[in-house]
Structure formats: structure tokens, C-alpha cells
Amino acid sequence: MSLEQRSLHCKPEEALEAQQEALGLVCVQAATSSSSPLVLGTLEEVPTAGSTDPPQSPQGASAFPTTINFTRQRQPSEGSSSREEEGPSTSCILESLFRAVITKKVADLVGFLLLKYRAREPVTKAEMLESVIKNYKHCFPEIFGKASESLQLVFGIDVKEADPTGHSYVLVTCLGLSYDGLLGDNQIMPKTGFLIIVLVMIAMEGGHAPEEEIWEELSVMEVYDGREHSAYGEPRKLLTQDLVQEKYLEYRQVPDSDPARYEFLWGPRALAETSYVKVLEYVIKVSARVRFFFPSLREAALREEEEGV
């Protein structure tokens, strides 16, 4: 049973738990490390112990599940004291535990913010601290920043400050697009991020992208033809039916192709709500923060910008 099907039978608090569970498959890894491409990772994937963030106390870290993989420590060389070996090992474990807790808090906050977006409600810093961050208030800037980045990259949702004095925020779709795919109660994951990715690909292909190239690029983020996706549902239906019916995409046979091949173009609604320039700027902006999942698109976007397109 998919996440969206499960949510139909859940109470609000149970839906949040189910959603946060699924968000373990969201790109938290991308938001936590600029050296990684944007892929769908799991909460069990813990950054290496080379991070400069200070470790938490053992009491604070022990609340996280113990399903964490640690790097095997090398055997001490002859003559080294047990104290010398114990120090780095303990530090490494505490660091890994701390980073794992932060990663889970990011996923939890993404789930909380998605519920706020679905309800079309603003959110305050105080709400986030009380409902999600709790004992990790000192880590709020990091957790909030990474959660905001994940929302933008995966779901196409921007977190915008509405009231600086009251630390109040609103959640809106990126690039001025009015589509999010939330057409019913069973649609719990916004699809704007998927739409933006496809629009970027088409723009980079000069306005029309072969279907096979679209699927090849989508496979980089583990979105495959015929395979249900935790965030986007059935991708072929979303790509060739839903977004076409919403007039964001055109899906047509390549003229004179035999055997028949198909391609995607921007639909009239996409052309009315955004522009090639905006999506190029989006690619450059995002890839300046993390290594973009389509490096070739970033390079093409930079070339287009230099040429004044």
C-alpha cells in the first residue's frame, strides 16, 4: 500500500507520522552535504564523522534508534595506549549519533511543514520549536535551513519569511507556478518539484525533449518508468497524463519518426506562469548551494546566461 493510500485511513497525527516515515526517503542527504548529488537517501544514511559540528552528549544522542552504521575502527598500532584509541572512537560514535539525530529532525520538520502547506497555514518559529525541534533548539538554524532546502528541491515549495519580527513564514510554490498536484485528500505530496525538474530539462533541450532522455535524467533521482515513487506516485501517469491535462506539458509524437518516438514541450500554462529565463536562474541558484543532480543542466544554464538567452 502506498503512502498516499495509507494516509486515507489515518487520523491527522497518524498521517503526520506516516508522512514523516516516508520523508526518510526524501533528499535530506542532499541538504546535509554539498558533496553529494541530489538523490533520495534514507535516514539510516549518516554523514561521515568528518563534520565540524560539535557532538551532543550521550544522553541527548541516545534517543535516536540504534540502526546506524559506523565505520569500523582500525586496530591500534603496537605501543599505542588504550586511552588514545578510546578517545577517537567515542568521539566518532557521538558525532555519528548527533548527525543522525539532526538528519531525522530535518525529515520531521519537512513533514510538519508539508502539513502546514496542505492546510494553507502560515507557520512560526515557535511552532516549529515546540512541535518538532524540541530539545535541539540550538540547532534550529541548521535544521530549518536544510528542511527548507529539501522542500524546495524535492517538492518545489519555497519557505518565505512573512513577518521578520514574529518569525512567521508562509509556504508557496516555486517559480510562480500554481500547480502542486494536491487534487484530493489522498494526494499528500506536492508534485511541483517534479514539474519544475521536467520544465528545466525541456528548456535545456531547446524547448522540446525526447521522452527517452527525460526518463534517463529522472533515473538519476531514482524515478523510473513503471515504478511507484514515494513522493511522486506513478511517474508515467504524472508525466504523460496529469501534467498534460493541466496544460503544463505537451506530449506528442516526433514528426516523421518511424518507429514512433515521443517528445515533451512546455504547455501553454507553463509558458503563461513562468519563463525559460526563470527556470535557468532556478538551476543556477540551486546548484550554487548543492551539487545539482543534473550537472549537464547547470553547465548548459550557465552557457545560456552568458549568451544572454
UniProtKB/Swiss-Prot annotation:
GO terms for cellular component: cytoplasm; nucleus; plasma membrane. It is found in: Cytoplasm; Nucleus. SMART domains: MAGE, MAGE_N. Keywords: Cytoplasm, Nucleus, Phosphoprotein, Transcription, Transcription regulation, Tumor antigen. Residues 45-64 are annotated as: Disordered. InterPro entries: MAGE, MAGE_N, MAGE_WH1, MAGE_WH2, MHD_dom. GO terms for molecular function: histone deacetylase binding. This is Melanoma-associated antigen 1.
